[in-house]
Design a protein with these regions (language model features):
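Membrane-proximal N-terminal soluble sensing/regulatory segments of transmembrane proteins
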Residues: 1-59, 63-174
Length: 174
């Protein structure tokens, strides 16, 4: 349990490896216990049940680790990194075109994203969707040569945020 908590608190894969090693040791101890019970002509069925629970716990934890890896361990990995790259693309294009209204709307979306990441509250998805509409309305005033790039980056950002929301929901929101 300690390695599990450390993995989610520190977001470092070494704790997943430690968890796996500890689970193997526990499983080996359970097998030894089962052999001892059998050698003493005692019922080893509870050791089998315990072994199955350890396997189930390990499997569930590995699924959660895979989910967290997909979400991201830091600002540059997983969906966190993808969101960051997409929004930086929009920011760069908006600055180059002196489109400060676009920057404003981008920052509002970023605010919704960060509020969701910090508070893990589904209400920020609704706020995000409202601000996407505002952003798209502001895009109507953009020069056509910049519009397709911004729209493409916005679509990527929106898709990644929706996927992040889904994955965080699967992981468990507060």
């Amino acid at each position: 349990r300690k390695h599990e908590k450390d993995f989610f608190a520190r977001k470092e894969t070494k704790y997943n490896e430690s968890f796996h090693e500890t689970a193997k040791k526990v499983h080996a101890h359970i097998n030894e216990l089962n052999k001892s019970l059998i050698s003493e002509d005692l019922d080893g069925s509870q050791a089998k049940v315990l072994s199955d629970l350890v396997v189930q716990y390990n499997t569930t934890f590995q699924k959660l680790v895979a989910l967290q890896l997909e979400i991201g361990l830091d600002a540059k990995s997983g969906l966190y990194g993808s969101l960051r790259n997409a929004v930086h693309g929009i920011e760069k294009l908006a600055k180059e075109a002196d489109e400060y209204e676009i920057l404003f709307h981008m920052l509002m979306l970023r605010r919704n994203e960060k509020d969701f990441m910090l508070r893990r509250d589904p209400k920020y998805m609704e706020k995000f969707n409202n601000n996407i509409s505002n952003f798209e309305n502001a895009l109507a005033t953009i020069q056509p040569e910049k519009l397709s790039q911004m729209q493409s980056s916005l679509n990527k950002y929106q898709a990644d945020f929706k996927l992040l929301f889904a994955k965080e929901s699967e992981l468990g929101l507060d």
